[in-house]
Amino acid sequence: KKLLIIPIIIFLCFIAQIFYMGHINESFFYNLTQTQNPYYEIKNINFHKGFLNSKADFTIEDKYNLGLISKLDFKFNNNYFSKFIAQGKLSNPFKLLDDKLQNKELAWFKIQSIQNDLNVSIQFQDINLSNEGGNALWENVLTEILLDKEDLKIKAIYSKIGQVDFSQFYAKFYLKNLDHQQKFEKPISFSNLIQFNESVEEFKFDFCEINNHTISSFYNKNIIYFDDDNQTLKMHSQGKANNLNIDLTSQIYQSIDFDQINFDLIYSQKKPDISDDKLIFKPSNEELNLQIQNITLKKDNQDINIKGNIFLSRQSHKAHIQISSLKSPDEIFTWGQFFGGLNQYFIKNEEGMFIMDLHYDSDAKTQLKINGNEFTDINLN
């Protein structure tokens, strides 16, 4: 009899956790559907509780009368030991893609429990609209969202795109192996996702082409935070681009290329808010400031360094930028000969550095000065 008690207890515990997980999954689903969002509305909520599995669904409709409607179907696993809490699919809201998508499904998703968090993995279907007029292609698109289990707020988001190719006639955009991730200082709601939030953001890709302008690889890290008693938004941006080629053959009969570009920038503005009607970001005082800590352009084993500051507002524009190089600008940029040479805008200091010191002030009588000398009186407003 004692031997029979052990399997009975195990069986009862298994049944108990099934009922418990069924209750947890139902609570999670209804908490998810109660989420308020200014961009879409959740309708037609259904939950069908089962023993080992529960099924649920709801529809999402946009609030801008665009006719975008998508249905989310869930299959919950009422077993604590299942790898995934739920799996499901997202129907396609764009009618023009119906013929290109298997079962008219835009994406599939899986929800997995990770300690106190939930990881939502969304795999999108590949889309290929290529025809005689051009290409419209995206492949291997994946998004993962890390949610706080308690209030379903976003702690981090990660996206990956294997390939994007849009080309029509003479216009072309191609991107390969894009990775983007953002970790938030504090968990945020879905409705705040497009706002400025304190976070660390990383962005990289292997190759990009825009109308014959190419970059072989790119990496960027942004630290976004608020300063001055939470009233000023700042973004510290650092990164590099390799093998940049700008096709200017139609303008100066050749391309401008750099082996590498390193940058260190700080962008700041007064904390933006959202207008009540359009939900669009607006700087509160329309003042923007860009500090160029350093930009280094590398070409043929030579460095061109750029530092300075740019200030923009509705009332005035100001800029102070210094460009320096050990090598003569005309030797680095041979295309300058078409404009009388670039050396004329530089002075050579005692250390042998070629320097351009540029000042611009929209309020001054002489708006633009190069190396202290008046350049022109044109108005750049």
State the predicted function of each range.
Residues K2-I18:
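Hydrophobic membrane-insertion alpha-helices, especially the h-region
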Residues C13-I15, F19-N381:
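Glycine-rich, small/hydroxylated-residue low-complexity segments
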